[in-house]
């Protein structure tokens, strides 16, 4: 028996040989099987687990990151809203209506694209206590000052579960007493809501206060039922719907006022939210006068008045001018009649934009908002073409005065008749120079000043000396002989009240002559100038252009004195021509040298001159 080795038995659980298997079996049963019988199933699980973790990991990270971003954005926006309107009774709270829902694992691809699906739910029996008195005013402020997400809440379609009145739903949406859909967010947002909002009251019902005040709430919340998932398209549609309803409400109240009901609606929008926001105030009085004042942060303002009664036109104009001067400190544009404009011109003051209106339409003020759609270049070209056509019909060139303005503003141009041009154009010859001297320095006048300087530099030295035109034409210095100048040299010249002679040659025609090609001189003609008359003309011209020549630059001054030098030489050359008749003009020797060599009498006579 000792030769036979002891029999070894294999444990069915741990697969190990034991001499005493019975003593080992209870211990192995308690531990459990290390390698189960279905080894294939357990070997396939470690291969699938990492894949599931890889798919769920980024989804969880995206959901957490975007949830934190939404919370921080909501807190910042709501804190700004509370700081912007501390005196108002309507309180804004963080949006508790945003609920993060995870999709099922079978839709993994859709969850990666849209991991967050906000759901808005309302409680069934919520009747919040409100502290404001006028619901319509609160609705205006809330609709204008809230962010796009809060405007989404206003255009929210009612879910099938909540069966509450539109007025109660609107009140709960305005105050912000919407609870989240998930239970873990109930704990988070329950501390942020105050006690007066969480408490419910059975006595207070907003739909019984005033049906007229609740019209806007019913209009805003009158939307079809549907699911609570909202897309960016629904966001833009909701914003447009709120704004159109507000504009319709404002228009209906304006029509009610015209029938005899006085109303006063003020809509304000915070400039911090939008830098290019407008502040519109509609003030309606019993006289039928409507003042539309539009302010913008860029400094562009416009005051337009339409008066119902023509008798009170002048008084209302003076009142609004004073109000605009006090309220709008920069960038204002005053619309005045011809009498006020001429009174200010006599004192040396001219408004920023002068609007000359004919007598037939003195008390009729038309809106100039339609001209903003047209471009500035098209208006200027059409205006110049009309002026040229009128000049060809009347055989004269009238004054061209173009008022330039920024494209965001308005453009108002009206031509002046010939009598108005002759009456108003008596102080200075150049209209652009007068506009530069009398109008204040602003970006509006910088463009006109630059254009005026260019035209003045090209024709400086001609418009200030009308007595010298025959000399220029006789010498052939000018590039061609315009018909207008030949006719003007024979016409009697205008005389101003100060005793000065004014030129009738227009500024536009003088500048256009420089573009023409040069022609050979037609020959020297006799002139009736004397030395004293020439010096007198130079002195008068210098006195006229002394005030504006400083801004013209160096080129205009050199051209001016070059013209004077040529005229003086032509005068002396004509005198020599009369004395030197025997000499042939086709000789190569200059006439002055020939006179000095041939005869001493002629030389003595020239020295005496």
From Swiss-Prot:
GO cellular component: extracellular exosome; mitochondrial inner membrane; mitochondrial nucleoid; mitochondrion
Keyword Hydrolase part of the UniProt annotation: no
Residue spans, topological domain Mitochondrial matrix: 1-552
Residue spans, topological domain Mitochondrial intermembrane: 574-609
Sequence ranges of Polar residues compositional bias: 418-441
Keywords: Membrane, Mitochondrion, Mitochondrion inner membrane, Mitochondrion nucleoid, Transmembrane, Transmembrane helix
Protein name: Mitochondrial nucleoid-associated protein 1
Keyword Glycoprotein: no
Location, primary (coarse class): mitochondrion
